[in-house]
A protein has these predicted regions:
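Solenoidal tandem-repeat scaffolds enriched in leucines and small polar residues
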Residues: 15, 23, 36-37, 41-49, ...
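Ankyrin repeat A-helix N-terminal signature
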Residues: 1-4, 32-54, 80-89, 122-123
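Alpha-solenoid repeat scaffolds
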Residues: 19, 26, 36-43, 69, ...
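Cross-kingdom leucine-rich repeat
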Residues: 1, 28-31, 45, 61-62, ...
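Ankyrin repeat boundary/linker residues
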Residues: 23, 73, 107-109
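Cullin-RING E3 adaptor/co-adaptor recruitment helices
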Residues: 49, 81-240
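Start-of-repeat signature of ankyrin repeats
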Residues: 26, 75-76, 112
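Ankyrin repeat domain, specifically the short helix-to-loop turn at the C-terminus of the second helix
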Residues: 10-18, 56-68, 94-102, 151-155
Length: 240
């Protein structure tokens, strides 16, 4: 997983390799990346960082050549995998969302799989089993950032028609999760505020990643920059 490997991949694509091709077994260009990300769980930390950097750079290259990380089936979707493990793969997920990847199935929409549903499902699952305050705070902060990234990528959030949560299953932080959920539902059913539409438009124009770095460089008042930014303390770039 050296720079030479990435150079070779870039050279192959420049010679016409099809990033949308699949093998006879149904493997896609993201199959190996998903496998490698799985190898980072519970392994050596330094090796995990090296794998994550490699997966990030290759994903960046593939998306630049038109690869879609949000196609179904879900187990072959890099976006779906990152959403399910949003705490672990947060930097890569942020890159995907800021680079135009759909937070729902890009072929069939939210009725197939939905980023909002996955995040709330994983949030409730993790917070039902952990009383660790620092873990809960970090998980909630990352979940809020992911939800905000998804909201800021479309004028109206695309939710499944039957989208709901069972807050009673969340033993800890249930009220905070309900507040997040209801604010999202309200955004879906209310007329969109002009400032939200402007935020979506500006962030779309600044894609791809890193959008927040580009916002900070704009000749705008600090108050406006603050509204445009997501996760004010971190652009995500330093985590790669």
């Amino acid at each position: 997983m050296s720079d030479n490997d990435q150079w070779l991949g870039a050279a192959v694509q420049r010679r016409g390799a099809d990033v949308k091709a699949t093998t006879k077994d149904g493997d896609t260009v993201f199959t190996c990346i998903i496998f490698l990300l799985g190898e980072t769980v519970g392994g050596d930390k330094e090796e995990g960082r090296m794998i994550n950097r490699f997966c990030f750079r290759v994903t960046q290259l593939l998306m630049a050549h038109g690869a879609d990380p949000s196609e179904c089936p879900a187990h072959e979707s890099l976006t779906h995998i990152c959403l399910k493990s949003f705490k672990l793969h947060f930097p890569l997920l942020r890159f995907l969302l800021e680079s135009g990847a759909s937070y729902n199935c890009s072929l069939h929409g939210p009725s197939c799989w939905s980023g909002f549903h996955i995040v709330f499902e994983r949030l409730c699952s993790h917070l039902s089993s952990s009383e660790d305050d620092s873990f809960s705070a970090d998980l909630l902060q990352k979940a809020e950032t992911v939800l905000e990234l998804m909201v800021a990528s479309s004028q109206i959030p695309k939710l499944p028609s039957d989208f709901d949560i069972n807050s009673t299953s969340c033993r800890f932080q249930g009220e905070k999760i309900k507040a997040l959920f209801y604010s999202l539902k309200q955004l879906q059913h209310s007329p969109q505020a002009l400032k939200h539409l402007c935020r979506v438009y500006i962030r779309q124009r600044l894609k791809p990643w890193p959008v927040d770095v580009k916002i900070k460089a704009l000749p705008l008042p600090d108050r406006l920059k603050w509204y445009l930014l997501i996760d004010h303390g971190n652009s995500g770039e330093e985590d790669i």
